[in-house]
Amino acid sequence: MRFVCDVMLGKLARYLRMLGLDAPYISNPAQLKSYANKSSDTVFLTRRSLKDTKHGNKILIKSELIDEQLEEIKEVIKPLIKSDKMMSRCIECNTPLVGVDKYEIERFVPEYVFHRYNAFSVCTACKKVYWKGSHTEHMMEWIEKFMTDH
């Protein structure tokens, strides 16, 4: 399942990626409409009306607040969230992350990070490097709270 987020939902796209979901963020309205029409397993998330899309599911997001936006789609996304997929996509560009040897990324991370951590992942598209530091712990705490709140 793919969740295509429109220009008004960039932050929501990042949170969906954190949860391991495929969430492209597309800002061009013409591109959005053709994207939504391509596949029936696409859910189009928007803060605007989409009268002329013919295929795919559409969800109109009413809130401007990220916590409320996630609540609006929680019933749809919760069954799709898998623990082994969390934190597996680039939060910036949605590309699946690839594990790399720490010595391959030594020059791309601060020295203290290189010496403190052993497991690293990289986005092959935008080259952003990820590691399981305190930021990941905070994200995982948020995910756990999100998954258990009713």
Range-by-range predicted roles:
Residues 38, 143-150:
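Short, intrinsically disordered terminal segments enriched in charged and Pro/Gly residues
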Residues 1-85:
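Long, charged N-terminal interaction/targeting segments
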Residues 95-99, 131:
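Short functional micro-motifs and their immediate structural scaffolds
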Residues 74-75, 92, 96:
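Structured, non-catalytic alpha/beta "coupling" segments that mediate domain-domain communication
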